A protein has these predicted regions:
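Short beta->alpha connector loops
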Residues: 35-38, 60-61, 151
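Short internal beta-strands
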Residues: 55-59
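Alpha-helical bilayer-embedded segments of polytopic membrane proteins, i.e.
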Residues: 285-310, 325-376
């Protein structure tokens, strides 16, 4: 219970977490997420699954600093041959522990890629999850598998958005081969993941999806946004490979449009706003009282916690691997903020008395949470006001040209989608594997 609470607090502080899809049902389950974010991925699953989860984790994590945390999560060690000094014969113990947990109706989580990574793609799956499921099924346990997609917007950035999508649970066919079940898991996982090269396409996918959603007034549900991003990512990859001249021309058009937006201080979503004075007055009537209360809170929190915030950011720069950067920030931030609160509380207690020290220790965590809310709330309100003023100040012809340019770019996306559908329909039906690969895009 405590481990689950800590996980929820940690991930909801660092990320803006969205959860979508099918709630994991009760009974014996094996959850199968992708693994882009080191130790934060188990915390995300624990925070969003809606039920207690036990994890299968590499045995080396049970040693040293992370040992108590891993044990608190009720993790089951797996002994990997690539880890030095590990006796892989002990995996018999792992299978026995997994079978016992599933027989008791528990939920197990294993990351079937076997590694944490920053490729932006689903890596080839190991067969361990399939072997666990088939082993439990052979012993009479009605186990179901749940594919999960972890989709970060900017995974190393504090307060960026993280979307966790749970797929439909499906039963294990006890007659299936290990390889067939592994392939089915991979296919189901791909439908929940936005696969985009973080160096080439990831930011572009987000940008294009924002533009398209604004122009088409597209459904704003989490599932719809992820589906759009999957199509856009696949379309960009295919276009760059098969029609590079079209890809470059479209990218140039998008960059020109973005430069014009920046020149006028505008965003896609504001081009259709109503700029009437009545709307402005209603906005001010709502936001000014909030600002009177929240701006001092935000300023106080910033002044008090600027030191641990800076130390956390500095420590994260020491990590070159982006798949562990967010984990380093969370762990480093927890340590730096806790020590800072302790130092200030001891200082207050020494100079103002024990009661003042205890009150300081109780008040500062509340100030940190309230300050985070206030900073985000007022930053959003300020951004809205600035965008409204920029739109109001732009000439009507400018707004019209920008909307037309946005519409043209959305039309290009529709043309790309139609092109991919046409190419897919012309693939030879005999080559089923290649056809399935194309359909996944």
């Amino acid at each position: 219970m405590l481990a689950g609470f800590i996980a929820r607090v940690a991930v909801h502080i660092f990320y803006q977490v969205d959860r979508a899809g099918h709630p994991p049902p009760s009974g014996a389950l094996i959850l199968l997420p992708n693994h882009p974010n080191a130790l934060l991925d188990p915390a995300l699953i624990r925070a969003t699954a809606g039920r207690d989860i036990r994890f299968v984790a590499k045995s080396t994590l049970f040693r040293g600093f992370f040992g108590p945390l891993v044990r608190a999560f009720g993790a089951i060690p797996v002994f990997r041959k690539q880890d030095a000094g590990v006796d892989v014969s002990r995996n018999a113990e792992m299978f026995a522990a997994v079978n016992a947990a599933l027989a008791a109706g528990e939920a197990i989580c294993i990351f079937p890629e076997g590694i944490s990574h920053s490729t932006g793609k689903l890596e080839p799956l190991r067969t361990g999850a399939a072997r666990m499921a088939l082993s439990a099924s052979a012993q009479g346990t009605a186990v179901r598998l749940v594919p999960v997609g972890i989709n970060p917007d900017r995974k190393t950035t504090f307060r960026s958005r993280m979307t966790v999508v749970y797929g439909q649970a499906f039963a294990v066919d006890s007659k299936a081969t290990v390889q067939a079940l592994t392939s089915e898991v991979a296919e189901r996982m791909r439908h929940l993941i936005v696969e985009a090269d973080p160096e080439a396409d990831a930011a572009l996918v987000l940008r294009v999806e924002q533009l398209y959603a604004a122009e088409r007034s597209a459904a704003d549900s989490i599932e719809a946004a992820i589906a759009r991003r999957r199509l856009i990512a696949a379309g960009l990859a295919r276009l760059r490979q098969e029609r590079p001249e079209w890809y470059e021309a479209s990218l140039l058009q998008l960059r020109r449009y973005d430069r014009r937006l920046r020149r006028f201080g505008l965003r896609d979503s504001v081009l259709d706003w109503n700029t009437s004075s009545a709307d402005a007055l209603r906005f001010m009537a709502r936001e000014l009282p909030m600002a009177i209360v929240l701006v001092p809170v935000a300023a106080a929190a910033f002044a008090v916690f600027v030191v641990p915030y800076g130390l956390t950011a500095l420590s994260a720069r020491l990590h070159k691997d982006t798949d562990v950067t967010a984990t380093a920030k969370v762990i480093g931030g927890s340590v730096f903020y806790a020590l800072w609160i302790l130092v200030l509380s001891v200082f207050a207690g020494k100079w103002l008395g024990l009661t003042a020290g205890l009150l300081t220790a109780s008040f500062l965590p509340v100030l940190a949470a309230a300050g985070l809310f206030a900073i985000e709330r007022e930053s959003s309100a300020f951004g809205t006001a600035r965008s409204w003023l920029a739109l109001r100040g732009a000439h009507a012809c400018t707004r019209k040209r920008l909307r037309r340019h946005r519409a043209e770019l959305a039309d290009v996306l529709d043309e790309v989608h139609l092109y991919i559908q046409t190419v897919n329909s012309q693939l030879p039906t005999s080559n089923s594997q290649e056809r399935q690969k194309a359909q996944d895009t």
